[in-house]
């Protein structure tokens, strides 16, 4: 049996395809491993709240005398960066007692398994996202017709220790966080709120899960998942009701981490640039405007191609 074609041009074509396949696979593995993230200098935001994430995909450490809480695990490849940042600040990964997740996507849950293994911490995930996280990201209902892709782009599956509903409280000693399920980006997207004391000020921190409406999501019948439109509308209302002083997000660019970090150098109090109620409300307003515009567009043209064109 002849396995190599006789025609030279066909042999060349097969060779080119093989090389492209290797390159594309390598790039795909790198993208799903760390998404091109770079190490970012960790720092104190306010009180016992620290930034320990990468240059864009975020992770936050809340420290306490009875153990620490870590929000989000980034990509699989950013877990070592997070642990290095925690150590650089003088803390131990083994003192992290609770891992929290904003949502099930691989750029925020991908590193949870490694962080859990290193720390021994218990992982809390909302009921809406717990199955997807426990499966390494597979089966996310908010992915809609592209749900099948989640079975190929998977991350190491962590152990989900606790599943919670909206309003749940998570406590580690004096640290208390409230789970605000702000679904839409995913079915269990969770925005965490908690107080921090910075000097003589008590500040409310809100970590917004995500307000990004994915281009493949259908807000009209048939909805990507039943109730997604109502979920988005509830999320905007819920977030506005929270009296946030400091707001954070799953991506650093969304809340201006780098700009605020630079402003710390000249601020009277290094926490002051992060006290940004106006920016918080503006981010919600802009996200809702995008949602309303997309809803109106889908009501005019509900086709998948219409959604894809607008999402590009």
Sequence positions of predicted segments:
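Short, basic/low-complexity N-terminal boundary segments at the transition from targeting/disordered tails
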Residues: 15-41, 143-150
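Conserved beta-strand hairpin/beta-sheet module of binuclear metal-dependent hydrolase folds
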Residues: 36-89, 93, 191-213
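Divalent metal-coordination and catalytic microenvironments
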Residues: 48, 62, 72, 82, ...
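Short, flexible loop segments at the rims of nucleotide/cofactor-binding pockets, characterized by
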Residues: 47-51, 74, 99-102, 223-228
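Acidic/histidine-rich helix-loop elements
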Residues: 34-38, 73-77, 135-150, 215-227
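C-terminal regulatory/interaction regions
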Residues: 2-26, 273-312
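Metallo-beta-lactamase
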Residues: 68, 75-77, 158-161, 169-172, ...
